[in-house]
Amino acid sequence: MPIYIDRRLNPKDKSLGNRQRFLKRAREELKRTIKEQVRAGKITDVDAEHRVPMPARGTSEPTFRPDRSSGERGYILPGNKEFAPGDRLPKPGASGGEGGTGAGRGGSDDDFQFVLSREEVLDLFFEDLELPDMVKLNLKEAVAYRPRRAGFATSGSPTNINVGRTMRNSYGRRIALHRPKRQEVERLEAEIARLEVESDKLGGKQLEALRAELESLERKRRRIPYVDPIDIRFNRFEQQPLPNASAVMFCLMDVSSSMGEREKDLAKRFFVLLHLFLKRRYERIDIVFIRHTHEAREVDEETFFYSTQSGGTVVSTALEEMQRIIAERYPSREWNIYAAQASDGDNIAGDSERCASMLRDELMQLCQYYAYVEIIDERETEIFGATDNGTSLWRAYRTVGDQWPNFQMTRIARPADIYPVFRKLFARQSASPTRR
């Protein structure tokens, strides 16, 4: 086991160990404050700035200092009108408020407040969460790449020359250096030819001047080439790595008539938190939204959260739709498949056992992780205190959880339960569950 020895020198009057412990305490205080604010407000408040108070006494790093309540210290104080030589002065207290008068007596420090940005809030909120078992057994060892346009370069293969950009640079350079145009040379040549025909004495002097000017123009044209090597530009390409381990999250929500506005609101809050978590922690992940009543269909994000459709309840239709989408677009040998389902547990007679059978025999063999959240009434928390009690869907899903350790289920009764339940389902694990 490797042993690390920190030989960094401490700064003056500081201790790196103390500073690290201080930063850890401050970070924990920020996380605790944000979680309390979100728990007391709306789940969507996570995706916003937060004004976080922190006690002023906790904003300074620990240092060694003399104890004012004990020991002897020598003072040299300025003169005043209140004390005479020989008077005994009381020692000031630890807060610095003792011995004062008026408004200064008994004072305390105000809380220090600052604003955390949206990115900082999300980083703290989802710091220790992750998708479980984010590994495929048959990941490709060689990383695949694809070329992507990345501007221009001054060197490269002749086949990648960008003619348009090269000629643009050439034209700009010729204008800046005042390269003589071909029309100017042709005009002088025509004038010289005309004077050579006349060949009089006056025309001879003018002819010499024109020939000298023509030679100067030709010399300048040779010195300033039409296309210079510095003008040439090549198309530049970067090799963009293709992701080997791709992930997809299926969000299954019951929107049947048995789900009241309260139940739907709790389910939507849970999925909003899940959506923020996935988009913040993972750059490349597909999210499939499925709503179901007596029939299920894949919808977009807007419809998933804001549609008012309702109807009967057949939970197995959502599992069938999920199974169909996996077969068409997400082969399990290439994708990490996750699912989160929210329902009130109400289901048509006989369908709960069918749902459990589909999960046990088919879907759980494809999924890395499956989370089931049941929305119950606050009064039912005491009735269904034992995990064996509950709706027919809950009891059927219990058999799935007994067989598959990567199947988790829990209940939500009030908005304050959402965040603890979310952390329970997606807490970072030291070891991933093994499939049976």
Swiss-Prot record:
Pfam families: DUF444. Coiled coil: none annotated. Residues 53-110 are annotated as: Disordered. Disulfide bonds: none annotated. Residues 94-106 have a biased composition (Gly residues). Belongs to the UPF0229 family. This is UPF0229 protein Meso_0256. It comes from Chelativorans sp. (strain BNC1).
